[in-house]
């Protein structure tokens, strides 16, 4: 078999559906041709390769490249001072009334140029890449005007031209109410549905549409309007749901066959059943749970029992999860949410790909999929979940390079 390069003497965690557990292959080989996996499996069953390059990984573990399916990487400014205020006892509402919160980030993002947003996002992206991330989802949602949302999405797309990484973009105009619409919520939803979504779809700048369904965000009726507009323009949807309260957002998302419903601390049985029926992925965000000192854990056992796929993400954002470590996310999911090692590793690979609608293309080590790999200096895959403040990444491979 002709191939561009082959990795030999490897241990594989393929995460392939149908294989038991992590899909472990103790003496494995991965071969790449044209940026796609040509073979991933036991050396004993491998064809004879005619490879331009052969790489001996000396018994290291190879997993699919990690995928971060929920981030807000593109923003300007920071909210460290608000963190200090919260530690001193100020409530989120008090900080918001004083001009902080999402509106603070909105002001900084609006004031920044596209080039400045790219420059600010690069260190955050680089931190993800340093831990094996090969695909990242990036949301808008800090511009909250047509021009600034377009600017944010262009900046997110530009990151894929600067770094070797896959980027998917999500329009999150229904994130918060900008000050100029303080007394006209439905007027802002009109803007999102009638102006922003058509303009963004026409430019091909978004791969999906998201919303924040909460008492401090947007109502289910308003989110339904956003979803209808998204569907009218051929865009799949996803939703921040049940983070702070239960507004049945997950069930609403499932009604629209959403790719994912995210957060889910307050998810109920009806929402779980709806997600299971629609195949909507539960994207869990333990960093936000930790940082906001939430006490209600997402219903992991019920999600597991219902067969709802569970993805994990950093939720990197300046207000509630200033986190750029998928390895720490896995540890948090195991320790705080009681997820298994297998669930954690699947959550940042296979199920993360599923949450982005990309499972046919990446997220597992299978022939035909993108040759996105993470090669690790560990003795067993559980170390990736078990250890904290530890980065054993040996090499990151994107599209075979």
From Swiss-Prot:
N-formimidoyl-L-glutamate binds at residues 142, 317, 319. One of its GO terms (cellular component) is cytoplasm. Its main location: cytoplasm. Fe(3+) binds at residues 70, 72, 240, 315. Binds 1 zinc or iron ion per subunit. Its cofactor is Zn(2+); Fe(3+). It is found in: Cytoplasm. Zn(2+) binds at residues 70, 72, 240, 315. Belongs to the metallo-dependent hydrolases superfamily. HutI family. This is Imidazolonepropionase. It comes from Caulobacter vibrioides (strain NA1000 / CB15N) (Caulobacter crescentus).
């Amino acid at each position: 078999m002709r191939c561009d390069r082959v990795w030999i003497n490897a241990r594989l965690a393929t995460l392939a559906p149908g294989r038991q557990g992590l899909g472990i292959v103790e003496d494995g080989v991965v071969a790449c041709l044209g940026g796609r996996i040509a073979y991933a499996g036991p050396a004993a069953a491998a064809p004879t390769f005619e490879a331009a390059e052969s790489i001996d990984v000396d018994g290291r573990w190879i997993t699919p490249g990690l995928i971060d399916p929920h981030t807000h990487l593109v923003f300007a400014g920071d909210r460290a001072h608000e963190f200090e205020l919260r530690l001193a006892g100020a409530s989120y509402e008090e900080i918001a009334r004083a001009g902080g919160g999402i509106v603070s980030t909105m002001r900084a993002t609006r004031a920044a140029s596209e080039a400045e947003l790219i420059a600010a996002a690069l260190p955050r992206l680089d931190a993800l890449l340093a831990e094996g991330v090969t695909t990242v989802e990036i949301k808008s949602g800090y511009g909250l005007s047509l021009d600034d949302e377009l600017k944010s999405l262009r900046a997110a797309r530009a990151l894929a031209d600067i770094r070797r990484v896959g980027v998917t973009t999500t329009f999150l105009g229904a994130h918060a109410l900008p000050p100029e619409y303080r007394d006209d919520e439905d007027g802002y939803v009109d803007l999102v549905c009638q102006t922003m979504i058509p303009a963004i779809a026409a430019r091909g700048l978004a791969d999906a549409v998201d919303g924040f369904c909460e008492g401090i965000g947007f109502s289910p009726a308003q989110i339904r309007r956003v979803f209808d507009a998204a569907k009218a323009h051929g865009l799949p949807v996803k939703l921040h749901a049940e983070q702070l309260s239960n507004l049945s957002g997950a069930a609403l998302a499932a009604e629209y066959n959403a790719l994912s419903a995210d957060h889910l601390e307050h998810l109920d049985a009806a929402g779980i059943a709806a997600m299971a029926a629609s195949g909507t992925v539960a994207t869990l965000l333990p960093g936000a749970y930790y940082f906001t000192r939430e006490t209600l854990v997402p219903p992991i056992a019920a999600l597991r029992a219902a067969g709802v796929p569970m993805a994990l993400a950093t939720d990197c954002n300046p207000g509630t999860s200033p986190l750029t470590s998928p390895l720490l996310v896995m540890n948090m999911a195991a320790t705080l949410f009681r997820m298994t090692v297998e669930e954690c590793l699947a959550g940042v690979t296979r199920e993360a790909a599923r949450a982005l609608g990309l499972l046919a293309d990446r997220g597992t080590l299978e022939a035909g999929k993108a040759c996105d790999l993470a090669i690790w200096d560990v003795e067993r895959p559980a170390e990736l979940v078990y250890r904290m403040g530890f980065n054993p990444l040996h090499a990151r491979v994107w599209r075979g390079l």
